[in-house]
Amino acid sequence: MLRDCYSACRGALQNGGIEAPDFEALCLLEHVTGYGRSGLIAHGDAPVPEEQQALLRELTQKRLTHYPLQYLLGEWSFMGFPLSVGEGVLIPRDDTEVCTDLCLEHLKGKPNAAAIDLCSGSGAIAVALAKLTDCHMTAVELCEKAFYFLETNIELNQAAVTPIKSDVMSCFLDFEDDIFDLIVSNPPYIKSADLPTLQKEVQFEPSLALDGGESGFDFYEAILCNWTQKLRHGGAMVFELGENQAAYVAALMRNQGFENIRTELDFGGTERAIIGIRQ
Protein backbone atom coordinates (compact mmCIF):
# COMPACT_ATOMS: atom_id res chain seq x y z
CA MET A 1 0.00 0.00 0.00
CA LEU A 2 1.01 3.60 -0.60
CA ARG A 3 1.05 4.34 3.12
CA ASP A 4 3.34 1.39 3.81
CA CYS A 5 5.78 2.47 1.08
CA TYR A 6 5.95 5.94 2.57
CA SER A 7 6.49 4.62 6.09
CA ALA A 8 9.25 2.26 4.97
CA CYS A 9 11.03 5.01 3.05
CA ARG A 10 10.71 7.52 5.88
CA GLY A 11 11.94 4.99 8.43
CA ALA A 12 14.98 4.07 6.37
CA LEU A 13 15.90 7.72 5.85
CA GLN A 14 15.41 8.51 9.52
CA ASN A 15 17.55 5.57 10.62
CA GLY A 16 20.17 6.62 8.08
CA GLY A 17 20.54 10.06 9.61
CA ILE A 18 18.90 12.03 6.81
CA GLU A 19 17.96 15.43 8.20
CA ALA A 20 14.36 15.76 6.96
CA PRO A 21 13.10 12.19 6.47
CA ASP A 22 9.38 13.08 6.35
CA PHE A 23 9.84 15.67 3.63
CA GLU A 24 12.30 13.63 1.60
CA ALA A 25 10.18 10.47 1.77
CA LEU A 26 7.24 12.46 0.40
CA CYS A 27 9.42 13.84 -2.40
CA LEU A 28 10.63 10.39 -3.39
CA LEU A 29 7.15 8.88 -3.12
CA GLU A 30 5.66 11.57 -5.36
CA HIS A 31 8.52 11.21 -7.84
CA VAL A 32 7.95 7.46 -8.14
CA THR A 33 4.16 7.13 -7.81
CA GLY A 34 2.79 10.57 -8.62
CA TYR A 35 1.11 10.78 -5.20
CA GLY A 36 2.12 13.72 -3.01
CA ARG A 37 1.00 14.59 0.52
CA SER A 38 -2.68 14.99 -0.37
CA GLY A 39 -2.59 11.77 -2.40
CA LEU A 40 -1.06 9.90 0.51
CA ILE A 41 -3.90 11.07 2.77
CA ALA A 42 -6.67 10.36 0.27
CA HIS A 43 -5.27 7.16 -1.25
CA GLY A 44 -3.11 5.69 1.50
CA ASP A 45 -4.58 2.24 0.92
CA ALA A 46 -3.90 2.30 -2.83
CA PRO A 47 -1.75 -0.57 -4.12
CA VAL A 48 1.70 0.29 -5.46
CA PRO A 49 3.02 -1.73 -8.43
CA GLU A 50 6.06 -3.85 -7.64
CA GLU A 51 8.23 -1.99 -10.15
CA GLN A 52 7.46 1.29 -8.38
CA GLN A 53 8.21 -0.27 -5.00
CA ALA A 54 11.54 -1.51 -6.35
CA LEU A 55 12.41 1.93 -7.74
CA LEU A 56 11.50 3.61 -4.45
CA ARG A 57 13.74 1.19 -2.56
CA GLU A 58 16.57 1.82 -5.02
CA LEU A 59 16.31 5.61 -4.70
CA THR A 60 16.06 5.36 -0.92
CA GLN A 61 19.23 3.30 -0.74
CA LYS A 62 21.05 5.76 -2.98
CA ARG A 63 19.91 8.67 -0.82
CA LEU A 64 21.34 6.86 2.21
CA THR A 65 24.78 7.29 0.59
CA HIS A 66 24.09 11.06 0.85
CA TYR A 67 23.63 11.32 -2.89
CA PRO A 68 21.65 14.59 -3.23
CA LEU A 69 17.87 14.35 -3.21
CA GLN A 70 17.70 16.92 -6.01
CA TYR A 71 19.81 14.74 -8.30
CA LEU A 72 17.57 11.75 -7.56
CA LEU A 73 14.49 13.76 -8.48
CA GLY A 74 16.13 15.35 -11.52
CA GLU A 75 14.32 18.62 -10.91
CA TRP A 76 14.18 21.32 -8.26
CA SER A 77 12.27 24.57 -7.89
CA PHE A 78 13.83 28.02 -7.57
CA MET A 79 11.59 31.01 -6.89
CA GLY A 80 8.68 28.98 -8.22
CA PHE A 81 10.36 27.99 -11.48
CA PRO A 82 11.16 24.33 -12.21
CA LEU A 83 14.81 23.62 -12.97
CA SER A 84 16.31 20.44 -14.35
CA VAL A 85 19.32 19.38 -12.27
CA GLY A 86 21.72 16.46 -12.19
CA GLU A 87 25.35 15.52 -11.80
CA GLY A 88 27.65 18.24 -13.06
CA VAL A 89 25.60 21.27 -12.02
CA LEU A 90 25.30 23.11 -8.72
CA ILE A 91 21.97 22.54 -6.99
CA PRO A 92 19.87 25.75 -6.68
CA ARG A 93 19.52 26.85 -3.07
CA ASP A 94 17.06 29.07 -1.25
CA ASP A 95 19.94 31.32 -0.13
CA THR A 96 20.39 32.44 -3.73
CA GLU A 97 16.95 34.05 -3.63
CA VAL A 98 18.54 36.80 -1.50
CA CYS A 99 20.89 37.64 -4.36
CA THR A 100 18.09 37.42 -6.92
CA ASP A 101 15.85 39.72 -4.88
CA LEU A 102 18.57 42.41 -4.90
CA CYS A 103 18.67 42.12 -8.69
CA LEU A 104 14.89 42.44 -8.95
CA GLU A 105 14.97 45.50 -6.72
CA HIS A 106 17.57 47.17 -8.96
CA LEU A 107 15.75 46.30 -12.19
CA LYS A 108 12.41 47.63 -10.97
CA GLY A 109 11.39 50.61 -13.06
CA LYS A 110 14.11 49.96 -15.65
CA PRO A 111 12.34 48.64 -18.75
CA ASN A 112 14.41 46.69 -21.27
CA ALA A 113 17.47 46.67 -19.03
CA ALA A 114 20.49 44.62 -20.11
CA ALA A 115 21.69 42.07 -17.56
CA ILE A 116 24.25 39.28 -17.47
CA ASP A 117 24.62 36.32 -15.09
CA LEU A 118 28.22 35.14 -14.72
CA CYS A 119 28.94 31.54 -13.60
CA SER A 120 25.29 30.82 -14.33
CA GLY A 121 25.26 27.07 -13.61
CA SER A 122 21.70 25.75 -13.89
CA GLY A 123 20.52 29.22 -14.88
CA ALA A 124 18.51 29.69 -11.70
CA ILE A 125 19.18 33.42 -11.38
CA ALA A 126 19.02 34.11 -15.12
CA VAL A 127 15.74 32.26 -15.61
CA ALA A 128 14.10 33.94 -12.61
CA LEU A 129 15.16 37.43 -13.72
CA ALA A 130 14.06 36.81 -17.30
CA LYS A 131 10.65 35.55 -16.19
CA LEU A 132 10.05 38.23 -13.56
CA THR A 133 11.27 41.27 -15.55
CA ASP A 134 11.51 42.33 -19.17
CA CYS A 135 15.30 42.60 -19.05
CA HIS A 136 17.52 41.38 -21.88
CA MET A 137 19.26 38.51 -20.08
CA THR A 138 22.56 36.84 -20.94
CA ALA A 139 24.00 33.87 -19.02
CA VAL A 140 27.63 32.71 -19.13
CA GLU A 141 28.71 29.20 -18.09
CA LEU A 142 31.93 27.32 -18.90
CA CYS A 143 31.33 23.75 -17.72
CA GLU A 144 29.83 21.56 -20.45
CA LYS A 145 27.50 19.61 -18.16
CA ALA A 146 26.26 22.73 -16.42
CA PHE A 147 25.77 24.45 -19.77
CA TYR A 148 23.55 21.57 -20.85
CA PHE A 149 21.31 22.19 -17.83
CA LEU A 150 21.39 25.95 -18.46
CA GLU A 151 20.08 25.47 -22.00
CA THR A 152 17.56 22.88 -20.82
CA ASN A 153 16.17 25.21 -18.16
CA ILE A 154 15.92 28.15 -20.53
CA GLU A 155 13.80 25.98 -22.81
CA LEU A 156 11.85 24.39 -19.95
CA ASN A 157 10.75 27.80 -18.70
CA GLN A 158 10.51 29.49 -22.11
CA ALA A 159 12.80 32.17 -20.68
CA ALA A 160 14.27 34.95 -22.80
CA VAL A 161 17.90 34.21 -21.92
CA THR A 162 20.89 34.12 -24.28
CA PRO A 163 23.27 31.35 -23.11
CA ILE A 164 26.99 31.70 -23.80
CA LYS A 165 29.43 28.84 -23.19
CA SER A 166 32.59 30.66 -22.18
CA ASP A 167 34.98 31.49 -19.34
CA VAL A 168 34.12 34.58 -17.31
CA MET A 169 37.84 35.03 -16.71
CA SER A 170 38.38 35.90 -20.38
CA CYS A 171 35.11 36.47 -22.23
CA PHE A 172 34.76 40.02 -20.91
CA LEU A 173 36.91 40.87 -23.94
CA ASP A 174 33.95 39.94 -26.16
CA PHE A 175 31.74 42.69 -24.72
CA GLU A 176 31.83 46.43 -25.19
CA ASP A 177 32.16 48.74 -22.21
CA ASP A 178 29.14 50.42 -20.59
CA ILE A 179 26.48 48.04 -21.94
CA PHE A 180 24.96 46.32 -18.89
CA ASP A 181 22.57 47.69 -16.29
CA LEU A 182 23.18 44.68 -14.06
CA ILE A 183 25.95 42.13 -13.62
CA VAL A 184 25.16 39.32 -11.19
CA SER A 185 27.17 36.31 -10.13
CA ASN A 186 26.94 33.44 -7.68
CA PRO A 187 30.60 32.49 -8.18
CA PRO A 188 32.62 29.66 -6.66
CA TYR A 189 33.54 31.01 -3.22
CA ILE A 190 34.66 28.11 -1.04
CA LYS A 191 38.33 28.04 -0.04
CA SER A 192 40.09 25.17 -1.81
CA ALA A 193 41.28 23.73 1.50
CA ASP A 194 37.71 23.69 2.85
CA LEU A 195 36.20 21.59 0.06
CA PRO A 196 36.87 18.21 1.76
CA THR A 197 35.12 19.46 4.93
CA LEU A 198 31.80 20.27 3.23
CA GLN A 199 28.76 18.15 4.02
CA LYS A 200 28.57 14.78 2.31
CA GLU A 201 25.83 15.82 -0.11
CA VAL A 202 27.91 18.73 -1.40
CA GLN A 203 30.78 16.36 -2.19
CA PHE A 204 28.67 15.07 -5.09
CA GLU A 205 28.38 18.55 -6.62
CA PRO A 206 30.95 19.83 -9.16
CA SER A 207 34.08 21.21 -7.51
CA LEU A 208 34.43 23.75 -10.33
CA ALA A 209 31.23 25.39 -9.10
CA LEU A 210 32.49 25.54 -5.51
CA ASP A 211 36.26 26.14 -5.56
CA GLY A 212 37.03 29.83 -5.12
CA GLY A 213 40.78 29.32 -4.86
CA GLU A 214 43.09 29.49 -1.87
CA SER A 215 41.36 32.53 -0.38
CA GLY A 216 37.87 31.89 -1.74
CA PHE A 217 37.95 35.29 -3.44
CA ASP A 218 39.48 34.47 -6.84
CA PHE A 219 36.28 35.02 -8.80
CA TYR A 220 35.21 38.16 -6.94
CA GLU A 221 38.59 39.73 -7.63
CA ALA A 222 38.63 38.74 -11.30
CA ILE A 223 35.04 39.75 -12.02
CA LEU A 224 35.41 43.14 -10.36
CA CYS A 225 38.71 43.78 -12.12
CA ASN A 226 37.56 42.73 -15.59
CA TRP A 227 33.81 43.30 -15.72
CA THR A 228 33.22 46.60 -13.88
CA GLN A 229 33.81 48.63 -17.03
CA LYS A 230 31.09 46.61 -18.78
CA LEU A 231 28.53 48.21 -16.47
CA ARG A 232 26.83 51.44 -17.36
CA HIS A 233 27.28 54.23 -14.84
CA GLY A 234 24.45 53.71 -12.38
CA GLY A 235 24.47 49.99 -13.10
CA ALA A 236 24.65 47.42 -10.30
CA MET A 237 27.02 44.59 -9.49
CA VAL A 238 25.45 41.87 -7.33
CA PHE A 239 27.18 38.86 -5.79
CA GLU A 240 26.18 35.96 -3.61
CA LEU A 241 28.54 35.67 -0.64
CA GLY A 242 29.94 32.93 1.52
CA GLU A 243 30.22 33.27 5.28
CA ASN A 244 32.50 36.07 6.51
CA GLN A 245 33.19 37.34 2.99
CA ALA A 246 31.12 40.53 3.00
CA ALA A 247 33.72 42.95 4.36
CA TYR A 248 36.44 41.93 1.91
CA VAL A 249 34.15 41.93 -1.13
CA ALA A 250 32.76 45.33 -0.09
CA ALA A 251 36.33 46.66 0.05
CA LEU A 252 37.03 45.25 -3.42
CA MET A 253 33.92 46.99 -4.72
CA ARG A 254 34.87 50.32 -3.16
CA ASN A 255 38.31 50.06 -4.76
CA GLN A 256 36.61 49.68 -8.15
CA GLY A 257 34.57 52.83 -7.61
CA PHE A 258 31.28 51.33 -6.46
CA GLU A 259 29.06 53.29 -4.09
CA ASN A 260 25.86 52.61 -2.14
CA ILE A 261 27.27 49.21 -1.23
CA ARG A 262 25.07 47.14 1.05
CA THR A 263 24.51 43.54 2.03
CA GLU A 264 21.42 41.44 2.66
CA LEU A 265 21.03 38.66 5.20
CA ASP A 266 19.72 35.17 4.54
CA PHE A 267 17.25 33.44 6.86
CA GLY A 268 20.13 32.25 9.02
CA GLY A 269 21.46 35.76 9.60
CA THR A 270 24.48 35.42 7.29
CA GLU A 271 25.38 38.29 4.97
CA ARG A 272 24.49 36.33 1.84
CA ALA A 273 24.41 38.92 -0.95
CA ILE A 274 25.97 42.27 -1.75
CA ILE A 275 25.12 45.04 -4.20
CA GLY A 276 27.01 48.12 -5.31
CA ILE A 277 26.31 50.86 -7.86
CA ARG A 278 28.91 51.96 -10.39
CA GLN A 279 29.38 55.73 -10.28
PLM feature spans:
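Conserved AdoMet
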Residues: 30-105
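Conserved SAM/SAH cofactor-binding pocket of Class I
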Residues: 94-196, 201, 222
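Non-catalytic accessory regions of SAM-dependent methyltransferases
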Residues: 1-33, 37-41, 48
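Short alpha-helix
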Residues: 243-256
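Short loop/edge segments at beta-strand edges and connector loops
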Residues: 165-166, 241, 265
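Glycine-rich S-adenosyl-L-methionine
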Residues: 144, 200-232, 236, 242-244
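Conserved hydrophobic residues forming the short capping helix/wall of the S-adenosyl-L-methionine
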Residues: 13, 107, 154, 227, ...
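Core SAM-dependent methyltransferase catalytic element
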Residues: 254-279
